[in-house]
Amino acid sequence: MDLFGETPDWATYLSPILTKYKNRKHPLAYENLYQLVVMVILSAQDSDANINTIAPALFEIYPDMERLSVTNREVLLPNISTVRNFRTKANWLIEIAQIIEKNENIPLTMNALTALKGIGRKSANVIMRESNQPAEGIIADLHVIRVAPRIGLISETKDGNKVEKQLIQVLPKSIWGEIGMAISFLGREICRPKPKCDLCPINNFCAYYANEN
């Protein structure tokens, strides 16, 4: 949405949330890259809070890719049984561990990550951002899917890949690595389903706020 009769300078408009949230760690309470990959896969269609709850006990049993690669599905399942779609995710985790074998073999490019079962573009973008890799895309989680259209940045769609594609078209590559999580944190804290607009650092440039006031 164009609020000002010309193409919006979104990089400038969004700079307050980039400043506010830049380099803030993802809410998944991982301690290393192996844990991050496992937790990102488990968190699909589930909550970060739930995955954080089950993770400590899981990683006591499976501290690395090597240990995970030699387990079997029936042994793994009870340890992730409270996770949504846990049976499918167990298959993914074991297959990935058998392919990768060791923690140091975990890939860190978009193509290599998305070649693994259970890792789509959103998950790959999270892994790459948290690993300080050059961005090849923009994180589009459920918060970004809700917030980006609301503020007028993109048109509305529930498809995360379409959201990411639109964001890539309107935002400079220099901010790809951080802007997805910045919008996500805004959505988690302020731009909730019932938004706290008066607290928002970018309400002056928000289509929703303009329409409501």
List the model feature ranges, each with a label:
Residues 2-213:
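Catalytic cores of DNA base-excision repair glycosylases
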